[in-house]
A protein has these predicted regions:
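Membrane-embedded helix-loop-helix hairpins and adjacent transmembrane boundary segments
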Residues: 1-473
């Protein structure tokens, strides 16, 4: 009942913001601090921040929170060093900024690559949404994915960035309130904080784990997350689009700082739920629907939720749904925006009217949602979906390396940038495919696709800029 009410409320808010939406308002225009924070936070607090981090909490402990902390550090990096530059350029998309630095050719290449990135990430959110509906409502996955996609697309098409900002305000509140309430109730139920820490310390002494250590998950994983977030935060269209739509530069910078502060702590709460699940599992009180003790971290959040009172359990479900909704909508909007601004308006119809752009924006946004849905249905049973998504994130971060060259080095040029971005895309995909086929990374176990993509971008941009030493006008 709580979930159905939440669905209806989300649609109503999205539809109410649709009245009189112009092309500029659809993509975002003159947003204030609160609107930017709520719209941007959705990019960083998706399904992985709930189910994924709770799984890390179950297995590794509180160090699983590094996932959202890394995202917060990335947004803070954007605030301190690039929010002012980006906003002063006055473009609505990352490819638009790349065009400002390198020219049209680089804009087209980057827009194609970043649209692919957005669609890959959007596909993962549709998979999460489909599985959510499958587990909660007993629907066939395909039906669940289609229904959720229709909901995402409907309210995003209705109000664009206005709808995303308005609905994400509600999503953000529900996520924090639902998860925080659950954490408090669960720890009190275990006998309070001292009893909780004592129980997990006993488990650690028996199993040789360190659930209360921030380093237990390992430096390679943490460093990979931090590097990907520092670079990716500066090229994440879904997270940056509200910033580019801010009313002025001080608003953009302030909103980024607040977004970082909102994003970073969330993983601490969901990791704690995973740790509670570990304690309950060791005590034999965390069981699945068949009565078997849960030992799989992937089931931690759902299984713990089933032990809560119905209303609180409904709030946690709503929080999980809010995390998915808050990410999926800005992602398909970002893909539609880049297709419209950086391909249609820049290449196909340079003199398009505002009415034409609004129409095309809605069509491309809807098509982005449909493509994500088809991809989700096709790949739901593929065990390598997360590898594909991480490859997309790595490519996004590597593109920022190319952009940095353009800001800081006079010899960086359009031809070098275009070829470098293509090479980086090929290397990123190859690195993931190699791991899928062989079960291990090329070169070294710690040399993930993040390092491979960044290294390729840095080296190829340096060499090619020296070879092609004239910047495109």
């Amino acid at each position: 009942m709580i979930i159905m009410c939440y669905f209806i409320l989300t649609l109503l808010i999205g539809l109410m913001t649709s009245k009189g939406t112009s092309n500029k308002e659809f993509h975002g225009a003159r947003l204030g601090v609160a609107a930017i924070v709520c719209a941007s936070a959705g990019e960083w607090l998706g399904g992985t921040a709930t189910t994924g981090v709770s799984e890390y909490g179950f297995i590794y402990g509180i160090s699983g929170a590094w996932y959202t902390i890394a995202n917060g550090l990335g947004v803070l990096f954007l605030a301190l060093f690039f929010a002012k530059i980006y906003r002063s350029i006055g473009r609505m998309t990352i490819p638009g900024i790349i065009e400002h630095v390198f020219g049209k050719r680089a804009q087209i290449v980057s827009s194609i690559l970043l649209v692919i990135v957005m669609l890959a990430v959007g596909m993962s959110q549709i998979i999460a949404a489909g599985k959510f509906g499958q587990a909660l409502l007993g629907l066939d996955f395909r039906v669940s994915a289609i229904v959720f996609t229709c909901i995402f697309v409907l309210y995003t098409l209705a109000g664009g960035m206005k709808a995303v900002s308005s609905t994400n305000t509600m999503h953000l509140f529900v996520m924090y309130f639902g998860i925080l309430t659950a954490v408090i109730i669960l720890i009190v139920r275990l006998g309070g904080w001292s009893a909780f820490t004592g129980a997990i310390s006993l488990i650690d002494s028996q199993e040789g784990t360190r659930h209360l250590s921030m380093t237990a998950i390992g430096f390679p994983k943490v460093s990979s997350w931090v590097i990907a977030s520092l670079l990716g935060a500066c090229t994440a269209q879904a997270g940056i689009q509200p910033v580019l739509a801010s009313k002025d530069i001080p608003t953009a910078r302030k909103a980024c700082i607040y977004t970082a502060l909102v994003t970073a702590p969330f993983g601490l709460l969901t990791a704690l739920i995973g740790i509670v699940g570990k304690v309950m599992s060791s005590q034999g009180t965390l069981v699945d629907l068949t009565g078997n003790v849960v030992t799989d971290g992937k089931l931690a959040l759902t299984s713990v939720m089933m032990t809560l009172p119905p209303v609180v359990g409904g709030l946690v479900l709503a929080a999980e749904l809010a995390a998915i909704l808050s990410t999926a909508s800005p992602i398909i909007l970002a893909a539609g925006t880049m297709l419209t601004k950086d391909l249609y308006q820049a290449k196909i119809n340079t003199h398009a009217s505002e009415k034409d752009l609004l129409r095309v924006s809605r069509v491309t946004t809807a098509c982005s949602g449909v493509i994500c849905c088809i991809g989700a249905i096709a790949l739901v049973n593929n065990n390598n979906v997360l590898d594909i998504v991480y490859s997309a994130y790595s490519l996004r971060g590597a593109l920022f390396v190319v952009l940095i060259y353009g800001f800081l080095w006079k010899k960086a040029n359009a031809k070098a940038a275009s070829i470098s971005m293509i090479c980086t895309g090929v290397v990123s995909v190859f690195w993931v495919l190699y791991k899928i086929i062989t079960g291990a990374y090329l070169i070294a176990p710690w040399f993930t696709e993040t390092y491979a993509a960044v290294a390729c971008a840095a080296i190829s941009m340096l060499v090619l800029s020296l070879v092609f030493n004239k910047r495109e006008a």
